[in-house]
Amino acid sequence: MAPDNRHCVFQYSREWLADGFSVSPLELPLRQDLFIAQKDSFAGNFGIFDDSIPDGYGRYLLSRLLRKQGIDASALTPVQMLSIVGKSGMGALAYLPETFVGEDKALPELDELQDLAFNVLSEKSDKDEDVLYFNSGNSGGCRPKCLMKDDEGEWLVKFRHVYDPAGFGKMEYDYNVAAAACGIEVPEFKLIDNKYFASKRFDIRDGERLHVATAGALLGLSLNELTMDYRNLLHLTGFLTQDPVQVEQQFRRMVFNVIAENKDDHPKNFSFICEAGAWRISPAYDLTLCREGYRGEHATSVMGNGLPTKADLIDAGTDIKIPESRCREIIEEIAATCESLLKQ
């Protein structure tokens, strides 16, 4: 931390400078400078490291767990929070020294985890935060989750929140089926017991952790600043990947979210993977129906419009050099697929 104890300081090691890569090209370019976090968006942290700290449901569990030990989570510095994350976060980043809060807990049956989550979220019980937290992998988002490993690989399993309908897991499954049919890359996914949606982790391959960064981290936008526009996201995709195929894939995701009414398209719901110094967009995730959004609008606007039109989608595409005819073709294709698979 800086002397004011309010802003983080970061410097790449000599060894990393010799053959590493920038973990966040816009905020932390690969050079020997001493970087000081400039924005207060992440409570004095850098966006890329704030990505590792749980938000939403995970933050809620951690705060309650710490409160049992007499610790006010809101008084902890970013470095102290990262120390609690330690090696248990998503992606390749790990933080030493580690601070352990409580003890590891075995993964219960999924039905039991769902019941425990309901009890904690509805504040009927305060005794199971540790079980839920230690099986969440410090994942973000508002809904309960757990990490699970089976013969097929490593999975992130979602549970219902107290306000979700009974068929919420099946709905997300259907949305992923539709997204794949729309030409969108999604992780391998499955529906467990016809109610728990599970997606294979894309931050692990052959047992190795991959570096993953959200668009929010890379652009310096927190969840409290819903100012991202798909225009920015498309240009970020072009800048990082230098690949028009990846840009068109991101365009497809924008079109799908608008047509399928997934308005929970905030900056942490888009990620990039860096492997051997080369960036690519991650498989799409958190694809489901969300008509409420943010005051009824998309969290990420399209050319400044939170309720985007077809013309806005085309403008966003042509702005990044996708031909207008190709934009129209993709929009019509996705609209027809969603009409067939999602509109009931």
Model-based region annotation:
Residues 1-267, 271-344:
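Phosphate/dinucleotide-binding and metal-coordinating scaffold of catalytic cores
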